[in-house]
Amino acid sequence: MKNNPKVSVIIPTIGRESLIRTLESVLNQKYQNLEIIITDDTKEGKAKPLIERYLTDPRIKYVINTKYKHGPSGNKNNGLDNITGEYFTIVDDDDIIMPNAIEELLNVAIKGNYSIVLANCVDNIEGKFTGLQYGKDEEVFWVDVFCGGYDGEYFGITKTSILENNRFNDECWGGEGILWFRLWKRARVGFYIHKALRVYSIDNQDKVSFQYIKKVKRTYLNYVLFLKEFEEDLKNYCPRSFIRLSLIGIYFSVLAGEYKQAFKMCIASVKIYPELFFMPILWTLFCMILPKSFVIQFYEKYSKRFKKVLKQFLLGGRSK
C-alpha cells in the first residue's frame, strides 16, 4: 500500500442546499488525494445546479442514480459503483467533516494495516458525542461492534478491497447495518479514534429515521433480512441482541401488515432466549391488539427511551 492512497468520498444527495457546505468541508481536507463522488437520487438532477461551479475540479464526479431503487441505500450503491480509490467513506449531504478527518483516519489505517478505522461524531445541536465510546483510542473487534459495544453514529474509512461486489440492499429503507456488519466480519478487527471528526445533523426532517412510517414495508424488510443473515452470529455471540432487534422488527412487521412475520420473530426470540419469553410475547400482543394509531404514537413518543432501556437491559457491557 502506497503512503498516499486515493480516498473515494461518496456524497449521496437529494439536492438539498446543505450539500454545498458538505462538499466544501470535503474540499477543505488537509489530505488532498481524493475522489469526490456526488450521487444524485433525483430524476431531474436537482443537485447539479448547486454544485455546477465546483465541477471544474477534476477530483469531483457527479452521477445520477438510475440503476438502483430510489432511497438512501440505492443512492449509496450508485456511489460505490463509481469508486476507484483504495479506501472509501460516505458523507451525508447535511453533515460536515473536520479538516483533518480523512488524514487522521488514513494515517491510522496505514500504520496499523486496518481495513476499517472509525472516529466519533458530535451532533449539530448540543455538540455531544453521537457514538458510544469508552474514553480512549483502541482496537475494535467485530463482535463488539456486532453486539452493540459500538453503537450510534461514527465516521470512518474502509479499505475498498474488502467491499468486493457487496452492496446495500436497495429494497430496504435504511438497513445499512447488514453491509457494514458483513464488512466488519470480514475485517475482524479495526480501530477507534476517540475524537469527533464529523458533525452529524440530527434536526433534518428529510433524514431516513424521520421517514420510516412512509416507507414502512421497506423498513420492515431491514429487520427480516438482518435477522435471517446474522441469526447464527446472534445466537453464538449475543442472543439478547436477537430479542432487542426482534422487538423492533415485530413493531414494523405489524405496521406493514406482516402479522405472520411478527409471530415468527416472537417465536424465534422465545426459542433463542426462553428466560425472557415474556418480553416478545407481551410486545407482540401489544402491537397487534391495540389500535395501530395508538401503537405508532406510543412508539414515536417513547422509542428513544424504549431502545435505550432495551440496550441497557439486554446488552449490558461489551464482550471484551
Give a label for each model feature.
Residues G15-N28:
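Short, well-formed alpha-helical segments that are part of the catalytic scaffolds
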Residues V9, T130-Q211:
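Conserved nucleotide-sugar donor-binding catalytic segment
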